[in-house]
Amino acid sequence: MWPQPYLPPHPMMLEESRQNKLAAAKKKLKEYQQRKSPGIPAGAKTKKKKTDSSPETTTSGGGHSPGDSQYQELAVALESSSVTISQLNENIESLKQQKKQVEHQLEEAKKTNNEIHKAQMERLETINILTLEKADLKTTLYHTKRAARHFEEESKDLAGRLQYSLQRIQELERALCAVSTQQQEEDRSSSCREAVLHRRLQQTIKERALLNAHVTQVTESLKQVQLERDEYAKHIKGERARWQERMWKMSVEARTLKEEKKRDIHRIQELERSLSELKNQMAKPPSLAPPAVTSVVEQLQDEAKHLRQEVEGLEGKLQSQVENNQALSLLSKEQKQRLQEQEEMLREQEVQRVREQERLCEQNERLREQQKTLQEQGERLRKQEQRLRKQEERLRKEEERLQKQEKRLWDQEERLWKKEERLQKQEERLALSQNHKLDKQLAEPQCSFEDLNNEKKSALQLEQQVKELQEKLDEEHLEAASQQNQQLETQLSLVALPGEGDGGQHLDSEEEEAPRPTPNIPEDLESREATSSFMDLPKEKADGTEQVERRELGFVQPSGVTDGMRESFTVYESQGAVPNTRHQEMEDVIRLAQKEEEMKVKLLELQELVLPLVGNHEGHGKFLIAAQNPADEPTPGAPAPQELGAAGEQDDFYEVSLDNNVEPAPGAAREGSPHDNPTVQQIVQLSPVMQDT
């Protein structure tokens, strides 16, 4: 929390102390008048002759006694004092109202300071949220880099395993390298990555279509080969059936030939037996009919020859048939071997086709897996791009909100500057009017008007001091808000897209103070200590104003150029150092206010020392002479009371009026001039000097 500014004492306490001091001054004045009244009837006449040359003051020719004239003067003085007391009460009431207004303004200033402090706490919370979001962004960037490295490793593995798709894998590596190296340019690289992935997907789809076409072509060729194989097998089966039928026929013919051969051999054997019988019969003596026998023998021999010829023919046929059978068996063996070889070739072709089909299926599986991995990578990249876009949108919204807030602060600052200018113009007009009134009132001899003007001056100066403190606090808060906005903009420029410039500039809240005229030093001060204190106090006031200006410059000047690459804890330390410096500056301001209060206490003590001077008879003549000089013929070196009043009104520090606690002289209302009473002359002469101190 901000330290509360040191407030002056309560106005009711000041009023009570003033009333008490006023009553004590009245008592002392009455006692002084009672002591001086019985023994100075003639002295009063001489003093009246010295101070004024009016015919009313001479009592030599009058019919009244000196005691009666003194009593009349006391009555007139009491009446004038009652009138001035009533006027002072009215002035006190008006000052009370003004003080209440000032207190109300102070409460409003406190409320505005609390609101500004709440706004600063909200800004600190937003800074914390932004730092947390920055840490989340760093973690996401780290994970994306790790994912990119993982993708590179996977792409290298795929490049080692998939020689057939080397070119596409190299494109994938380039795409992954582009993802890892160009993450700060998501808007441009996202479209490029999508185009590359789309192109690669199109390429894989085309290759898959080509492979599917190749597979269909191979399957069609395989089906055609299978059909050819089936036709060839049918043809071989038909030829085999024909050869088997032919072999069966040849075997049947061979069997019939063997049977015929057996029959022929059996007939030949029978003929040989019959021939042997005939030979035996021929060897016997011829019978009675030899011609018949010879004819029979000849016939049998002819038949035997014929049978031998037939047997030889059958043997040749059988031999040729055997040779044909051997040739057919060789042909059948050769055909069987050729068929076996063709079947082996067909089996090998089938195995090769099956292997090729398996290889194509494996390649299709690898392509499907690769396409699946590419789709997964594309999905991950899309999700990552969506997250980054959401984060960018959130950062843009936060930046827009900060810009709007900064714009509101600028508008508020402009309104404050305009309000301050209006207040300065009003203060200048009030100062001119007050100076004009003071000139008129100083021309008049009544002390009540001087008291009223001094009270108004003190109230105006109090209001001016409160306004200055309020303006300083507003400038502090605005400067701190501007510095925090600049730090936020530097952090956002590091996180957001490159190319954005720094958002804010330092607020220049230095006030150009109006030149303050130094009060004129009166030459009629006889005490060296009074003159030295009178000369030192303006220097102290100037030193105080210089300190306040240095504090204001310390609030305005930046603590240093913050580095955008610092870690978040250094940012918190730099942000925490600003409130500490503000606390120190506020403590210095409070210390200055305490010093001013001590000066006011010293002025009150000097006010208490004024009244004992009234009883000093030796200093009475000096103060009387000092009162006559500014009223009748002012010295050229001594300043007029108007100048002193105007100079006291333009000072920035608190001033306490000393004329409110002194009762006016009894003859002031009657005569209309301060020359009739020496007490009035003393207080009138000392009041501007004490106001300057």
Swiss-Prot record:
Q: Which UniProt keywords apply?
A: Coiled coil
Q: Which GO terms describe its cellular component?
A: cis-Golgi network; Golgi cis cisterna; Golgi cisterna membrane
Any one Pfam family match given in the protein's UniProt record, by short name:
GOLGA2L5
Carries keyword Ligase? no
Q: Extract the ranges annotated as region (Disordered).
A: 1-72, 497-551, 629-650, 660-679
Q: Where is there biased composition of kind Pro residues? A: 1-11
Keyword check for Coiled coil: yes
Please list the GO biological process terms of this entry: Golgi organization
Coiled coil spans: 77-611
Listed Basic and acidic residues bias regions? 537-551
Write out the similarity annotation: Belongs to the GOLGA6 family.
What name is this protein filed under? Golgin subfamily A member 6B
